Swiss-Prot record:
Pfam families reported in the protein's UniProt record: PALP (PF00291)
Similarity annotation: Belongs to the TrpB family.
A GO molecular function held by the record: tryptophan synthase activity
Subunit architecture: Tetramer of two alpha and two beta chains.
Protein name per UniProt: Tryptophan synthase beta chain
Modified residues (N6-(pyridoxal phosphate)lysine): 99
Source organism (scientific name): Methylobacterium sp. (strain 4-46)
EC number: 4.2.1.20
Functional note: The beta subunit is responsible for the synthesis of L-tryptophan from indole and L-serine.
C-alpha cells in the first residue's frame, strides 16, 4: 500500500463522510442511519453552543475533579536514568480513569436530545462504571453490556455498576469479551431507537463517534500543554499512552499532533507476544477491515473473520483500534509499539514501588515501553505518560497471577 501523503495538518479530520484517509466512515445497517444522523446533528449543535460547553466544563471541575495533575515521577526517572518522566494523572478523576471525560459529554448530549435510556458496552468495566455513575447523577436508566468473561475477571466493577443502579447484561456469545458486548449494544440500539442513546466508550464505532469521543477526551492534552508550559516553560518532547480502542491516547495526542517535533508513542497489548497469536495488537499484527461501523486495522484470521484478542488487561483486548489511530499509523505521525503481559506486570510492580501509585494494567502497558524509551533519551527530555486509570480493579487479578491470594 502506498504511504499516504503527509497532510498540512493532522488535526482536521474526519472529512464530511467521517473518514480519516481510507479509515473510519459509517458502515451500519440502514435501520441505524436515522439514529446516527440525529446524533451527528445534535453533536454539531452542542459543540457550537457555549451553554453546553459551559455546563460540561462546570461538571468537569466540580464533579470529575479536573484539571488532573501533571506529576513529575522523580524516582522512576532516576531509576531509568534518562528522560524526565511526567504522569498525567487521569486515575485521580472521579470513577478512577479517563473514561468519565467522554461519558460526561455524551450523557449531557443524551439529556439535550431527550433520551432517557442509556446503553453502553464495557470491557474492564471502567466505561460501564463511568456511564452508570453519570446516569445515577442525572436520573437516567442505564443498561451495560459486558462480556461474560470480563464479568468474571472484573467483579469489583460489576458490583459498582449495580450499586449505581445499572442493569449489567453478561454477553454469552462469541468470545464473551468486549467485541461481543459491543455487538449486543448495537443490536439493542437498533431495536430501541426512539428513547435510547448509545454511549460508546472509545474512539471507534461509526461516525460521529470517533471524532466526538476524541473531542471529549482532548481535555487531557489541552491541560497537559498548559501544565507543562507552567512547570517547565516549554512543551514536552514525547508522549506515551496505551491503546485498546485508543481514547485515552487520542485525548492526550490530538492537541499535540501538529507540533511535529514532539515524538508520539502508542502502546498496544502484545499479550503473550505478537508472534504467539495471543495478543490484541491490531496495528502490529492486523490488517484493514470493517468492524462496528468503521474501517480500521483489525485482527483477522486467514478467512477474514475477526480473530480473538488476548490481553492481561480487560480494557485492551479489543480486536480493532480507533480509525484515527489507523490513519496516524499510516501517515507515520505516531509510532505504535506493543508490550507483553509479563512486561506490563513488571511495570505495574515498579510503578507501585517507586512512585506509590498503583496503575491500572492498561497504562502499565505504556509504562512498560517507557522503561525502554526513557533510558535512551537525554536528561532534559520531557516525557509525558498518560496514567489513564488506577489499579484497584486489577488487584484481585494480579494477586491471583502472582499467587498471592488477598
Amino acid at each position: 500500500m502506498n504511504a499516504p501523503q503527509t497532510p498540512n495538518s493532522f488535526r482536521t479530520g474526519p472529512d464530511e463522510r467521517g473518514r480519516f484517509g481510507i479509515f473510519g466512515g459509517r458502515f451500519v445497517a440502514e435501520t441505524l442511519m436515522p439514529n446516527i444522523l440525529e446524533l451527528e446533528r445534535a453533536y454539531a449543535e452542542a459543540k457550537a453552543d457555549p451553554a453546553f460547553q459551559g455546563e460540561m466544563n462546570a461538571y468537569l471541575t466540580h464533579y470529575v475533579g479536573r484539571p488532573s495533575p501533571l506529576y513529575f515521577a522523580e524516582r522512576l526517572s532516576a531509576h531509568f536514568g534518562g528522560a524526565k518522566i511526567y504522569f498525567k494523572r487521569e486515575e485521580l478523576n472521579h470513577t478512577g480513569s479517563h473514561k468519565v471525560n467522554n461519558v460526561l459529554g455524551q450523557i449531557l448530549l443524551a439529556r439535550r436530545m431527550g433520551k432517557p435510556r442509556i446503553i453502553a458496552e464495557t470491557g474492564a468495566g471502567q466505561h460501564g462504571v463511568a456511564t452508570a455513575t453519570l446516569c445515577a447523577r442525572f436520573g437516567l436508566k442505564c443498561v451495560v453490556y459486558m462480556g461474560a468473561v470480563d464479568v468474571e475477571r472484573q467483579k469489583p466493577n460489576v458490583f459498582r455498576m449495580k450499586m449505581l443502579g445499572a442493569e449489567v447484561v453478561p454477553v454469552q456469545s462469541g468470545t464473551r469479551t468486549l467485541k461481543d458486548a459491543m455487538n449486543e449494544a448495537l443490536r439493542d440500539w437498533v431495536t430501541n431507537v426512539a428513547d435510547t442513546f448509545y454511549c460508546i466508550g472509545t474512539v471507534a464505532g461509526p461516525h460521529p463517534y470517533p471524532a466526538m469521543v476524541r473531542d471529549f477526551q482532548s481535555v487531557i492534552g489541552r491541560e497537559t500543554r498548559e501544565q507543562m508550559l507552567a512547570q517547565e516553560g516549554r512543551l514536552p518532547d514525547s508522549l506515551v499512552a496505551c491503546i485498546g480502542g485508543g481514547s485515552n491516547a487520542m485525548g492526550l495526542f490530538h492537541p499535540f499532533l501538529d507540533d511535529r517535533e514532539i515524538e508520539i508513542y502508542g502502546v498496544e497489548a502484545a499479550g503473550h507476544g505478537v508472534s504467539s497469536g495471543l495478543h490484541a495488537a491490531s496495528l502490529t499484527g492486523g490488517k484493514p477491515g470493517v468492524l462496528h461501523g468503521n474501517r480500521t486495522y483489525l485482527l483477522m484470521n486467514e478467512d477474514g473473520q475477526i480473530a480473538d484478542a488476548h490481553s492481561i488487561s480487560a480494557g485492551l483486548d479489543y480486536p480493532g483500534i480507533g480509525p484515527e489511530h489507523a490513519w496516524l499509523h499510516e501517515v507515520g505521525r505516531v509510532t505504535y509499539l506493543s508490550a507483553t503481559d509479563s512486561e506490563t506486570l513488571e511495570a505495574f510492580r515498579l510503578c507501585s514501588l517507586m512512585e506509590g501509585i498503583i496503575p491500572a494494567l492498561e497504562p502499565a502497558h505504556a509504562l512498560a515501553k517507557v522503561a525502554e524509551l526513557a533510558p535512551t533519551k537525554p536528561r532534559d527530555h520531557l516525557m509525558v505518560v498518560n496514567l489513564s486509570g488506577r489499579g484497584d480493579k486489577d488487584i484481585p487479578q494480579v494477586a491471583e497471577i502472582l499467587g498471592d491470594a488477598l
